[in-house]
Design a protein with these regions (language model features):
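Cell-envelope/ECM-targeting effectors and their regulatory/trafficking segments
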Residues: 1-170
Length: 170
């Protein structure tokens, strides 16, 4: 696991909250999710702020709950999830299901983006042969070391792909 470089002490924020911490959140979201042009810094955690939080969480492989807790705050500060695990064949976890989902993106997204999907199996959270083949194909396309292991460079490119397809899935 890649260690978290900083510890953030901010309150947990959710839909309906107001105040200066929400303004700070909105400033980070404008920087991290610039494609949400209707997001304004007004200190109100409204539907647009919620959408921006969920998009950011999706793009950084965080739990998509719309709640800004410690890990989401840390990710907002550093621009990516702070606790990215090293994943490889045989692993079982929620992160793998999220990766499978991103690598499997729907045919209509494939047509729109002019890209193929990478994963064609069941989204089951198991890093098996199909997931490993998908990761290797993805690594090859991105000109990374093709080892089937999801380390920091592969995570970076997966987050780029998640950002690209988030327009279609959220």
């Amino acid at each position: 696991m890649i260690p978290s470089p900083i510890q953030i002490k901010q309150p947990t924020l959710k839909f309906g909250d107001t105040g200066d911490y929400v303004k700070q959140l909105q400033k980070f979201l404008i920087k991290r999710v610039p494609d949400i042009q209707s997001l304004v810094i007004d200190g109100v955690f409204d539907e647009i702020t919620l959408l921006a939080v969920e998009i950011f969480q999706y793009r950084t492989f965080l739990k998509q709950d719309g709640i800004v807790g410690v890990v989401t705050w840390e990710a907002l500060y550093i621009g990516q999830r702070p606790d990215l695990p090293l994943l490889y064949s045989g692993c079982h976890c929620d992160d793998i299901a999220k990766i499978q989902s991103v690598l499997k993106f729907a045919p209509f997204i494939q047509e729109t983006l002019g890209m193929k999907g990478y994963y064609f199996g069941k989204i089951d959270g198991v890093f098996g042969d199909r997931t490993q083949a998908a990761v290797k194909s993805f690594q090859n396309d991105k000109q990374l070391v093709v080892d089937g292991i999801i380390g920091s460079q592969t995570w970076d490119y997966l987050m780029e792909l998640a950002a690209l397809i988030s327009h279609f899935v959220l």
